[in-house]
Amino acid sequence: ISDKAEIDDKIGAVNGTLLPAMDKNGNYFGVMNDFFGHGTATSATIASKGKMVYDIYNDTKKSTILGIAPDVSILPVKSLWFGDVFYGWMWAAGFENEESKWVYAGEPKADIISNSWGVSNFPSLEYVPGLDISSHILNALVIPQSLHQNYTGTTIISSSGNSGHGYGTMGMPGISSFGIAVGAVTSNDFVGYGPFKGQPRFGNTTDHSDHVVDFSSRGPGVIGDPKPDLMSIGAYSFVPSAITKLPGDGCSGGGCPNESFSVFGGTSMSAPIAAGSAALLVESLKEKSMSYDPFAIRNLLMSSAEDLHNDPLTQGAGLVNALDAVRIVNGHGGKFLVHNDATFSNIKEAIDVPLSTFNSDLFGIDEFGLSDKTFPITSWYGGRLNPGEETTTTFTIENPNNYPIDITIKPETLKLIENLQISGITEPHLQDP
């Protein structure tokens, strides 16, 4: 969002104005076109119908590529390049821009917002990631009643980022406290394929899969809250691509397909896999007429995730498992829902002070602030503690049916391994030493 007004000479519109798809005077018309292919790949990861047949491995064995939730509807929102992320989020979440003010229209246009993009470079933000303007807005969009008394909240899922493997490498929007951040694990589908032939980086046999990828960004968030939340495939797999794709596009090093599919990956793939899983979950909840909010979706996905036996700041709750999440909703045995009563309040307390400096009037938001209600969250954030202070919480475990389940609780201790000091001078807004 620009800090000054600019008026287009041709159409007479101020920058940041939402325009109709077609100008009645014939000066312009809008075209939704994914010229790079990234949006097509992320959408196909979620919604591919799996009807096209491909010879992926050049062995005459035909394959289809099915999305996670093939019956969903995709609402494309142009937000980067010729667009604005903030405007796109607000509109998809059910707000309309009227005379430079955002007015809630009564319900979100999308059940889930999926973000396969991110900014991990501090200087380009001019704010600490997690306390930046976009993170404040994302947090408010997730929480019911934050922007309007009737606002129901929107589930927002984002890539954790590809800046790993160090801790504290997440950027916005994945680092926002109340959104769902998704990191990347390996797949064995691409082993020996095309440009990956002979590469040992992710394992050269099909025995290797579901390992956390080196580039997957790690937590924690800037206030110390646990991130990421979930993991899914990000290195790598196949997706349908645009029908305008030329032979060899998006592939190098030999073995490039002549058909309209591509190798895709990164946490840009992980996020839509989780978003598709959330869509299946929403479908199940609606079929059973069960009430839910973004925190219920988050807790169901995290409670049903498969533990990959990494620390929480690397893997979150673990590998997303849509089937087990739906099984909890349907009351099947073997899985349970877990959440605590302190995380939401502790996060809110930590971000309330920087949030108070945010001038929402500049963005046309009259009712800005985080709801005073509390919401259960699976992961635990103990708050900001001074030396010698303690914190506690109460975890609630919900069995989805009447059959007994066995639960094992294993305490773990985190300890300092080594203390290092780095000397250097940081140039503000430019680079770190």
Q: What is the meaning of each model-derived region?
A:
Residues 1-87, 105-111, 122-124, 150-153, ...:
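Subtilisin-like serine protease catalytic core
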Residues 2-19, 23, 174-275, 279:
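Extracellular S/T/G-rich loop segment that most often corresponds to the catalytic His/Ser-adjacent loop
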Residues 2-32, 55-62, 94-109, 143, ...:
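Surface-exposed intrinsically disordered loops and tails
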Residues 34, 76-193, 222-225, 246-272:
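Substrate-binding/access-modulating region of protease and related hydrolase catalytic domains
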Residues 43-45, 75-79, 169, 232-313:
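Hydrolase catalytic cores
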Residues 45-52, 88-98, 116, 140-144, ...:
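Structured segments of extracytoplasmic/periplasmic soluble domains
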Residues 161, 322-433:
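Secreted peptidase-domain scaffold signal
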Residues 198-203, 231-255, 298, 302, ...:
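Flexible glycine/proline-rich, aromatic-decorated loop/lid segments
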